[in-house]
Amino acid sequence: MKISEEEVRHVAALSKLSFSESETIEFATTLSKIVDMVELLNEVDTTGVAITTTMADKKNIMRADIAETGVDRKFLFQNVPEKENHFIKVPAILDDGGDA
């Protein structure tokens, strides 16, 4: 299955990534090869093979629900470059909402 350069540009825009023209071409080629390889799995005969959902034999491993003392706030804030109202201030990663 061929992944077009336009599809790469569209997904990049949704992801707020920017690629050069050569990178876009390279991604389209590489992604097309990956999809082709995955599509080969459709040709594997799995008749009689039991469905496998996980390889782990353990289920619902939980720790005891014990309250623990948190980190001292003064110690935590020693290396914080910016703080506001007792919170760590970080750069905004979301814009006004847009249509992305």
Swiss-Prot record:
SUPFAM superfamilies: Glu-tRNAGln amidotransferase C subunit (SSF141000)
Major enzyme class: ligase
The organism's place on the tree of life at top rank: Bacteria
Gene Ontology MF term list: asparaginyl-tRNA synthase (glutamine-hydrolyzing) activity; ATP binding; glutaminyl-tRNA synthase (glutamine-hydrolyzing) activity
Gene3D superfamilies: Glu-tRNAGln amidotransferase C subunit, N-terminal domain
Annotated GO biological process: glutaminyl-tRNAGln biosynthesis via transamidation; regulation of translational fidelity; translation
Enzyme Commission (EC) number: 6.3.5.-
A Pfam cross-reference name: GatC
Catalytic activity: L-glutamyl-tRNA(Gln) + L-glutamine + ATP + H2O = L-glutaminyl-tRNA(Gln) + L-glutamate + ADP + phosphate + H(+); L-aspartyl-tRNA(Asn) + L-glutamine + ATP + H2O = L-asparaginyl-tRNA(Asn) + L-glutamate + ADP + phosphate + 2 H(+)
Keywords (A to Z) from UniProt: ATP-binding, Ligase, Nucleotide-binding, Protein biosynthesis
Keyword Cell inner membrane assigned: no
Function: Allows the formation of correctly charged Asn-tRNA(Asn) or Gln-tRNA(Gln) through the transamidation of misacylated Asp-tRNA(Asn) or Glu-tRNA(Gln) in organisms which lack either or both of asparaginyl-tRNA or glutaminyl-tRNA synthetases. The reaction takes place in the presence of glutamine and ATP through an activated phospho-Asp-tRNA(Asn) or phospho-Glu-tRNA(Gln).
HAMAP family xref list: GatC
Record-stated family: Belongs to the GatC family.
PANTHER family in UniProt: GLUTAMYL-TRNA(GLN) AMIDOTRANSFERASE SUBUNIT C, MITOCHONDRIAL (PTHR15004:SF0)
Assembly with partners or alone: Heterotrimer of A, B and C subunits.
Official protein name in the record: Aspartyl/glutamyl-tRNA(Asn/Gln) amidotransferase subunit C
Top-level taxonomy: Bacteria, Bacillati, Bacillota, Bacilli, Lactobacillales
